[in-house]
Every structure is written in structure tokens, then in C-alpha cells.
Amino acid sequence: MKKRIISLLLAAAMTFSLTACGGNSSDDKKEETKTENTENTDNKENKETPEVDTIHWGRANSGNILVTIAKQQGYFDEVGINVIEDPVESSTAALQALQAGQVDVTSNQGTNNPLQFISTGSDFSIVGGYMLKGMYIIGKKDTQYKDVTSLKGSKFAYAGVHPVVGMALLDAGIDPNNDVEWLTYSTNSDRLAAVVSGEADYAVLSGDQLYAVGNNDQIEIKAWLDDLVPNYGCCRMNMNTDFVKKNPTTVKLLLKSLIRAEQWYLANKEECVKILAKEIGAEEDYVAAYLLNDNYVSSVDPCKNSVVKTWDAMIKMGFIDQEDADKINIEDHINTELYKEALDECVAEYHDEDPDFYDGRVKFFEENDQ
């Protein structure tokens, strides 16, 4: 009974909460069929041929700037992949679509949501990432905040215990379930309003609210979640394990294109504001508020160590039933090999274009995935 109650609460929380990297739009059924590519790979340029040349990506309404850039710069075309973005209405809808094979990849559903699905039997593999960090805690300007210990005894607006905040509380010896009162609000805008009205002392918000926060003189950002749990791996890139096993070249080439897009994004952020604003139909000031923020950081890296830490913390906090966890080796659901192959090839082919970027990606992988 306890297990069923926890599962229902978690399902409700995921259904109504916005994703870590922004909300999602309406869900369209996938209509195209993947095209099996049977061309001979022994061509003049000796290019690899993807096993499947059409990828369906579950798209949140905040978009994925790396996918947009990879399309516009022709990186997907160069490796023979066509990425179709299919709108999904929520984190739960995105992961259910992935489970059903309606989409091939999702990237805007945080880390805890795909891990929750894995814990209940979904055979997903985390193969990369989108946002590394970018979420934050807000409070009224006159609310005294020193560090995570200031949250003890507070009223916190979120849909249940926030996993990253919960991890930080556990590290500080504070029981996240009993020492903080969690108030459930279904959207980021509702959580923001709860703090402004005084119903809640704090709230966790994502990048899509940075413009609103910056233009509200009653509140301020108290802490970035990365200050509490460094490199917590905000949004992971998820695929069905069976798809990854059958199409390793496709996945590697997809990651390779995204790594190149990440380099271009970091070198051209101002231009990316215009590109993404046009792509999602938003004002440039709104997009600039998060895309140009130094704390809003992308990374295609799988961040294996952070994923494992989040998994362990979710078990401690009751998000994942211990009996379910005992049946699963979470490392079997984190594929770092294909990302490493993609990164190695990028370094070999494009290192001279931006040595600092590629050296940094290699160092980051060594520190966060081994």
C-alpha cells in the first residue's frame, strides 16, 4: 500500500509539474516511419552510415537550442540524420511517448523523472544530456537565507520534495520529508506567485521564469542548485535501450552533431538568443534572460556520477522503492561509451576550431563519468 501511494503521488507530481528546463506544448502523434538506411558505407569519403536516418525528438516548448543549432548549421545533414521534433505536453507525456516508441529521444525532463520511470521497469538508457545546471531557489528579499540549513522549518513551493534540494538537505543532516513543509503547486508560475504572496518561503524555478524573476522587485534568487550540488545534471538525454543497441552508429553521430552544436552555441550566444526566440515564438528579452545567464549551462555529457548520486538520493528520500532499486543496476542504464566515441572523433576532427572547448569537454568527462 505504501509503495502504491508513493507511486501515485510521484505520478501526479510529474504530470502537473513543469520540466526542469521549461514547460512543454501539445503532443502530436509521430506520423513518419523511421527510414532504414541501407546505403553502402564504403563511399568516397568513407563516412559512416547511420542505421536509421530519421530520429523523432520529443520537444518541450522551451525547445532545445543544441538541436536547433545542429539543424541550422547542417551538422545533422553532414552525418546523414534527419531530426524531427514532436511536441509533447509534459514530462510524463514525453517519457510515456518514449516508452511507447512514439519518439526516439527526450531531453527536457530533468534527471529524476527518467530515473523514476527506470525504477518501475522502463528500459531507458541515458546517453547524454542537455542542461547541466540552471535551476534556482527564490525567496522574498527580506527572507534571510545563509545556506541550505536556512531551509529547515520553511514552507517550500514545489510538487513534492525537490530531488536536488533534498540531496543537499540530506548532505546537511536535515530530513527533507519532515524538516521542510512542501507545498504542491502545479506550475513554475504558480510557485513564483506563492512566494510573492507569502504562501511559501521558497520555491525552485527553472530558466523559463528568469525573466519574470528579474522583473519582480519583491523577490530574488537565494541560491543556484549547482551551489548546493555541483554539476547535478539538470536534464538528461534519454533513449530506449533497445534502440541504442540496434543503432549505435546513429546514436554516436547524433551525439557528435550535438557536441559540435554545443561548441557553436557557447561561441555565439548572442546570435543564439535570436535563433531560439524565433524558433519558439518568444521575445528575445525572455530568451536572453536564461540563455545569457552564466548559471544556465548546457552539456551533452551524460554526467554518469551525478546520475548515480541522484538515483541513490531518490532511494533515501522514498522516491524509488528499495525493492525496485534492488533489482536494478542503474549503471546499466547509463551509456557513456557512445558519447566518448563521439567526443573522441570531434577532438580528432575539430579540435583546432576551439581547443579550449574540446580540452574542457575531455577533462569534464574524465571528472564526471569515470
Regions found by a protein language model. Name each.
Residues 316-370:
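Conserved C-terminal helix/tail region of periplasmic/extracytoplasmic solute-binding proteins
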Residues 81-84, 99-110, 120-124, 154-157, ...:
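Alpha-to-beta junction loops
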Residues 50, 116-127, 176, 212-226:
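Ligand-binding "clamshell"
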